[in-house]
C-alpha cells in the first residue's frame, strides 16, 4: 500500500502542487566541468570580415567543435558595450563572443541554448568574473556556470577565454525548473537619463515608465507579467511587507558578494546596471553578471580615475555607495532599513569571510586556478597583457581580497568603521599601501 502511494505521488506530484526537481543538465558536467581547460574551435569562412563588422551585432553562421564534438550551423556574434567599443577603438580584435546553438536550427549543446566567451577585458588576472561567480555560488546565489576554454579559429590559436552560460532559457530551466518565471536585464539607453526603472524604483503603474526593464525581457511577456513586476516594485518602494515581493535571502546573499568585490559598474554604482532580474509569482531576485570591472577597476577608466587601494580595501559594507546613489537603490536601501534583514546581511558576511577566506579555501582556489591556466596565458596570442603582467595581477587580486576580508572582519566586529560617515570621523583602516590597483588591468594596457 505504501509503495502504491509513493508511485501515485511520483506520477501526480505536480498536479498536487509538488514541484519535481530537474536533473542536472548534461552541459554542466561537460563544458562547464571546472577542473580543466576546455577546447573550442570556431570554424567560419569569413573570420576577418566578421571582425571588421563588429558593430553590427549580427549573427554569422559557423560550425563549432567543443572538446571534440561537432555542432553545425551555430549562430556567432560579437557582444559587449564599452568593452566592444574600446577594443575596436584601440585597433584590437579580442572581442567577447556569443554562441547561439539554436539560432539557425533546433539544436542544443547537451541542453544548453547559448554561451558567451569572455575575453577578460581590463582583467589581467583572467580571474575577476571566475572568482566572483565562485563566491556567488558559494553563497547559494543562482549563478551562471563557467569554465576556462582555449579558443581556436579554423584551427589557429585565438586565446584563453572564459566560457559562460548565458542567462537565458537553459539557465532558467536549470535553476528554476520548467515552470520558471520571467527574466529581465534592465539597462539604460543613455546614462544621462534618470533611469529610475533600472534602479528598480516605483514611479507609477504606467508600463512605459519601465521600458528599460520590459524591452530587455529575455522571454515573451504580457500585460499581466508587467503588472505583477510593477506591483513588486511598488511594495519595495513602500518598504513594508518586503517578503511579499522580494526573495530576501537571495538578495542579501547577492549583496554580500557584490559589496565585497567593490563592483562600481553595477546596481550599487552610478550606472545601476549589469545585473539580471528574475520574477516569479510576484517575487524578485537579483542575479550576477559582468564582473570584468569589479575589484575597483571601473574607477580606473573614469575621466578622473581614483587609484586608492586603501579606500577600496576598506570600502564600508553598510553604506557601499554615496547617499545620493544609495537613496535611489531601493533593493539595497529599503531592505537594509529593516533591522532583521540588516543583521542577517551581517551574518552572511560573517559566513563569507570565515568560510571562504579565513578557512584557507580562497587561497587554495586561486592557487589551483593559477596552476590550471598559467601555461595557456603564457601562449595567448591575443592577450590584453603580458605573461608577467598576468602573474602580477594574480598576486594583486589575491592581496586585495585578503586585505578586504581583514577589513570586513574588523567592520563586522566594530573595530573598523563600516559607514562612510564613520570613516570620515575614524581614521582606522587596514593598510593597503602594498596594493597597486592598475596592476589588475587598466585601459593604458591596451596601448602597449
Report each predicted region and the residues it spans.
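Phosphate/dinucleotide-binding and metal-coordinating scaffold of catalytic cores
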Residues: 1-448
Amino acid at each position: 500500500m505504501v509503495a502504491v502511494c509513493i508511485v501515485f505521488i511520483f506520477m501526480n506530484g505536480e498536479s498536487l502542487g509538488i514541484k519535481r526537481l530537474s536533473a542536472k543538465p548534461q552541459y554542466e558536467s561537460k563544458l562547464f566541468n571546472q577542473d580543466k581547460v576546455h577546447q573550442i574551435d570556431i570554424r567560419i569562412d569569413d573570420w576577418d570580415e566578421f571582425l571588421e563588422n563588429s558593430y553590427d551585432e549580427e549573427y554569422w553562421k559557423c560550425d563549432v567543435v567543443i572538446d571534440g564534438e561537432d555542432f553545425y550551423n551555430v549562430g556567432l556574434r560579437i557582444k559587449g558595450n564599452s568593452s566592444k567599443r574600446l577594443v575596436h577603438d584601440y585597433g584590437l580584435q579580442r572581442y567577447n563572443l556569443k554562441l547561439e546553438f539554436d539560432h539557425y536550427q533546433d539544436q542544443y549543446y547537451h541542453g544548453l541554448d547559448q554561451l558567451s566567451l569572455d575575453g577578460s577585458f581590463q582583467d589581467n588576472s583572467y580571474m575577476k568574473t571566475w572568482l566572483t561567480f565562485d563566491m556567488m555560488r558559494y553563497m547559494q546565489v543562482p549563478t551562471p556556470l563557467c569554465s576556462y576554454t582555449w579558443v581556436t579559429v579554423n584551427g589557429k590559436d585565438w586565446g584563453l577565454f572564459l566560457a559562460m552560460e548565458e542567462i537565458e532559457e537553459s539557465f532558467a530551466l536549470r535553476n528554476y525548473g520548467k515552470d520558471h518565471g520571467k527574466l529581465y536585464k534592465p539597462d539604460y539607453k543613455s546614462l544621462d537619463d534618470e533611469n529610475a526603472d533600472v534602479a528598480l524604483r516605483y514611479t507609477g503603474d504606467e508600463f512605459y515608465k519601465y521600458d528599460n526593464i520590459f524591452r530587455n525581457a529575455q522571454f515573451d511577456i504580457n500585460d499581466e507579467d508587467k503588472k505583477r513586476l510593477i506591483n513588486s516594485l511598488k511594495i519595495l518602494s513602500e518598504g513594508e511587507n518586503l517578503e511579499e515581493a522580494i526573495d530576501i535571502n537571495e538578495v542579501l546573499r547577492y549583496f554580500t558578494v557584490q559589496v565585497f568585490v567593490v563592483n562600481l559598474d553595477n546596481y550599487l554604482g552610478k550606472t545601476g546596471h549589469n545585473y539580471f532580474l528574475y520574477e516569479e509569482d510576484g517575487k524578485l531576485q537579483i542575479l550576477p553578471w559582468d564582473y570584468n570591472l569589479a575589484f575597483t577597476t571601473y574607477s580606473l577608466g573614469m575621466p578622473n580615475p581614483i587609484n586608492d587601494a586603501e579606500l577600496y580595501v576598506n570600502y564600508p559594507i553598510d553604506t557601499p555607495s554615496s547617499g545620493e546613489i544609495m537613496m535611489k537603490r531601493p533593493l539595497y536601501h529599503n531592505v537594509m532599513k529593516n533591522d532583521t534583514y540588516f543583521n542577517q546581511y551581517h551574518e552572511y558576511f560573517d559566513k563569507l569571510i570565515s568560510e571562504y577566506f579565513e578557512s584557507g579555501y580562497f587561497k587554495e582556489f586561486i592557487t589551483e586556478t593559477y596552476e590550471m591556466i598559467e601555461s595557456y596565458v603564457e601562449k595567448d596570442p591575443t592577450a590584453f597583457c603580458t605573461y608577467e603582467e598576468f602573474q602580477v595581477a594574480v598576486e594583486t587580486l589575491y592581496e586585495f581580497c585578503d586585505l578586504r576580508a581583514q577589513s570586513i572582519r574588523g567592520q563586522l566586529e566594530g573595530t573598523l568603521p563600516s559607514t562612510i560617515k564613520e570613516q570620515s570621523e575614524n581614521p582606522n583602516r587596514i593598510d593597503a599601501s602594498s596594493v597597486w590597483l592598475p596592476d589588475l588591468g587598466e585601459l593604458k594596457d591596451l596601448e602597449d
